């Protein structure tokens, strides 16, 4: 049985939750150092053999949208007092350190910002700093610390009068659910996803009564957040081997992303591949091929940053459909792309898959 693997989680905040799980026919791709979460161990199910072709986990360095949960609480750029001006500069330095992959420096700067925020009793600065600290802990895999910091952020937001159905509260709740998923706390994870999805679906239903030109941007953000919640929940359901439910979640997420972002958006391509993986895990190889073929076509058109991984995914599904010659050609194309991007991890994986395909071809001749 050839193996099919999921993409790795999306960028920044979601990345710490670990690699996306393999389908039930597959073992997970070995983790890279530093990753955590449900994918940290290898899974083997349905008697999958020790070797076999699998879909690479994509880095998926893409976001549904980039706003942080407490963005609306960010201190103003036009600070009138010296303390707030200093806090703003510290926060800018911290974010720059995070972008430069200097987490230790960012953490020290954020602690200085938090101290100043408390000393000046600046509630917005306190909230925003907690949010940044929580996000930093999350991407570093410090899940227990991140959980407490996200809860502190939520407490300040709610204490400041923000409603429970506000997108910022739902986004933090999603991050908490992802933490519980990474910790294999199934009851808490599923309850968190259910809260996020039901809250946003109810909010969207109520907003349908508004005129089309009222708060259109806010409604679009709500739809995108719902898509992100569906995506995260589907990922966990697939990990939990609830395949048909995962498929339905991915179908809804893909529909939202296509409607709001468009078919050529990088995140849409990610979701097409994810849905294909869920279908493949259920043995629906022809349906999986349709989605993965479309994802690869679009990835080529837009020069997707993880094109080589999309192609590797496509090759694995072709093998499941016993299209070995075509699979070899796609793997070779994927290898060239991986070498161009100097992705040594993917290069090694694709070479292993080509070697396995050669062994299988010799057995069939």
UniProtKB/Swiss-Prot annotation:
Which keywords does this chain's UniProt record carry? Cell cycle, Cell division, Electron transport, Membrane, Mitochondrion, Mitochondrion inner membrane, Repeat, Respiratory chain, TPR repeat, Transit peptide, Transport
Q: Where is this site: Cleavage?
A: 70-71
Give me the Gene Ontology terms describing cellular component: mitochondrial inner membrane
Transit peptide (residue range): 1-52
Compartment(s) of residence? Mitochondrion inner membrane
Gene3D superfamilies membership: Tetratricopeptide repeat domain
Q: Name one Pfam family in it.
A: TPR_12
Cross-referenced SUPFAM superfamilies: TPR-like (SSF48452)
What PTMs does it carry? Answer: Proteolytically cleaved by PARL.
Q: Where are the TPR repeats?
A: 127-160, 170-203, 220-260, 269-302, 308-341
Where does the UniProt annotation place the signal sequence?
none
Query: Does the record's keyword annotation contain Nuclease?
Result: no
The alphabetized list of GO BP terms reads: cell division; mitochondrial respiratory chain complex III assembly
Major subcellular site:
mitochondrion
Q: What does the record give as the function of this protein?
A: Required for the preservation of the structural and functional integrity of mitochondrial respiratory complex III by allowing the physiological turnover of the Rieske protein UQCRFS1. Involved in the clearance of UQCRFS1 N-terminal fragments, which are produced upon incorporation into the complex III and whose presence is detrimental for its catalytic activity.
Q: Which family does it belong to?
A: Belongs to the TTC19 family.
PANTHER family this protein is in?
Answer: TETRATRICOPEPTIDE REPEAT PROTEIN 19, TETRATRICOPEPTIDE REPEAT PROTEIN 19, MITOCHONDRIAL
Indicate the quaternary assembly.
Binds to the mature mitochondrial complex III dimer, after the incorporation of the Rieske protein UQCRFS1. Interacts with UQCRC1 and UQCRFS1. Interacts with ZFYVE26 and CHMP4B.
Q: What is this protein called?
A: Tetratricopeptide repeat protein 19, mitochondrial
Source species of the chain: Rattus norvegicus
Give me the gene this protein comes from. Answer: Ttc19
